[in-house]
Amino acid sequence: MKFFKFKKTNVVSLINFTGIIAPNMGRKKGLNIQDYNKLIEQAFQNKRNKAVVLVINSPGGSPVQSEFLADRIINLSKEKNIPVITFVEDVAASGGYWLACAADEIFASKASIIGSIGVISAGFGFDKALNKIGVDRRIYTAGKNKSLLDPFSPENKDDIKRLKNLQTKLHEHFISFITLRRGKK
């Protein structure tokens, strides 16, 4: 019988984040903490692990899921004392950049799209089209803000003000996270 000695080597775990960051909505799958938590935990489990590498190709998406994913990676990195490195493929924009900033270092091609620290909300207004064809919109609610920015009703200045306020708070939170993680890099 022959015996072979195997040398224990260092390990680097790799996690691919490709696509839109979003909660699961039926059959539509996005990058989210529900689907990636176990994978993230496994990446930090190996005792010979010298680093965890995030490969990101995402235009962003849900700020909530972006923050959940980034926080989980940051917390495990601190807990296990394992550095995190991000490689950006084509794009790490908005929530994709939020996720990339969970790393200690970020590497990208000169052609990669990185950044876009902002908040966007979009919709359509169908109220004039409905009026033109003689359709009345009827909404019955109990409580405030239940039909906020309803696309079938005319825009309401108070609704827009409330949305802008929410966007501003989220944008400030996003900027503070990036500043904390990236500093003056």
Ranges and model annotations:
Residues 1-81, 91-98, 103-184:
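Small-residue-centered hinge/linker elements
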